[in-house]
Amino acid sequence: IDKYRKWDYKMPENFKSYLYISQLLQARGIKTAIEAHRRAKPFCMGTLYWQLNDCWPVTSWSSMDYYGRWKALQYYVKKLYSEVLVLPFVENKKLNIYIISDRLKNINGRLSLWLKDFDGTILWGYSSDVKIDANTSKPYFSIELEKLVGENDTCSIVLEAEVKEGKKLLSKNLFYFVKPKNLKLKKPLITFRHMKTEKGYR
């Protein structure tokens, strides 16, 4: 775990943080594999990951623990195995936006892309109607990385990609230009409210 963690993440401050980072590391690794397999359609028409759950309380590869609690990976694979997946992928110094569809009918959708900084400011945007071919994986947009990034600091930006069918969101994916340990994340100010209801809290 520590060997691979050093590739992508900084040293966690304590054991609790170490456990959390190890879950993110696992989720990111499996995400990379599943996206590659799905992008390779029709040469790869399916993929399984090891493993779904545990038969006793243990440190393992599972995406759910013995008690059925979801780890980071379980949240990732729920989105990764959606029937439509939008996928930013770098090839030959270009950022290509693939859309993978497992549906057996064509989709009239809309592809939207935004380059944002970590304050949420939109630095660049693109939107276009797309006819998503049934049961395929192919690129629907391409741009030179250098042109997209421009003068922006790659450690401080993210590309947000989404595909909609009408008002329904089919897929959303984020693309970072550097490893997580190199991101210049700002400490957020998070506020929340909760309210007691008959069914619990919301």
Listing of model-derived features with the role each one plays in the protein:
Residues 163-171:
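Short acidic/polar inter-strand loop motif in beta-rich domains
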Residues 20-22, 64-65, 129-135, 148, ...:
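Short, contiguous acidic/charged loop-to-helix segments that flank catalytic cores in large enzymes
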Residues 94-143, 153-164, 201-202:
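Beta-strand-rich binding/interaction modules
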Residues 85-86, 102-106, 147-153, 191-194:
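Short linear motifs in intrinsically disordered
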Residues 1-110, 114:
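Substrate-binding clefts and catalytic carboxylate motifs of secreted carbohydrate-active enzymes
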Residues 59-60, 126-128, 173:
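Short hydrophobic alpha-helix segments
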